[in-house]
Amino acid sequence: MTRSEKVEIIAKLEEGFKASEAIVVCNYRGLSTKKLEELRNNARENNVKVQIVKNTLANIALNNSGKTGLVLKDTNIYLWGEDQLSVSKVAAKFEENNDKFEIKTAHIEGEVADVAKVKALAKMPSRNELLAMLLQVWNAPITNFTIGLNALKNKKESE
């Protein structure tokens, strides 16, 4: 890889890392190409970027984008995106289904996060799910009132 290619990779990573709310670093050693493609497809569906990069290049891009503190060792695959829940869910779900895939560390909301925080975020409902729950709670009194009125109407008609 030439120096100009490295500079280009660093620039692209830096741009992506600056715009991201979450970066998850994972071990992918031993995964087949088919499994990696499955991860990429799942990530693409959830607006999450996935890339395998040398640690030195990733470290430079992370430092240039202000995301410091991550300790990068061995082979890593990087997942990042604007929505921290999506990034966490993609990584955690893929880890559950693949023994050779392991979440190592993350950088979420400007600070280094451990595996437990990533998994906790993955369990949280998405924004759309939360809105659906809220609407369900708001509609419950109206629904119950309507059911009560309908029951009263049926009772009056049967008398």
From Swiss-Prot:
InterPro entries: Ribosomal_uL10 (IPR001790), Ribosomal_uL10-like_sf (IPR043141), Ribosomal_uL10_bac (IPR022973), Ribosomal_uL10_bac_type (IPR047865), Ribosomal_uL10_CS_bac (IPR002363). GO terms for biological process: translation. PANTHER family: 39S RIBOSOMAL PROTEIN L10, MITOCHONDRIAL (PTHR11560). This is Large ribosomal subunit protein uL10. Part of the ribosomal stalk of the 50S ribosomal subunit. The N-terminus interacts with L11 and the large rRNA to form the base of the stalk. The C-terminus forms an elongated spine to which L12 dimers bind in a sequential fashion forming a multimeric L10(L12)X complex. GO terms for molecular function: large ribosomal subunit rRNA binding; structural constituent of ribosome. NCBIfam families: PRK00099.1-1 (NF000955). SUPFAM superfamilies: Ribosomal protein L10-like (SSF160369). Keywords: Ribonucleoprotein, Ribosomal protein, RNA-binding, rRNA-binding. One of its GO terms (cellular component) is large ribosomal subunit. Belongs to the universal ribosomal protein uL10 family. CDD domains: Ribosomal_L10. Forms part of the ribosomal stalk, playing a central role in the interaction of the ribosome with GTP-bound translation factors. It comes from Campylobacter jejuni subsp. jejuni serotype O:2 (strain ATCC 700819 / NCTC 11168). HAMAP family: Ribosomal_uL10. It comes from the Bacteria.
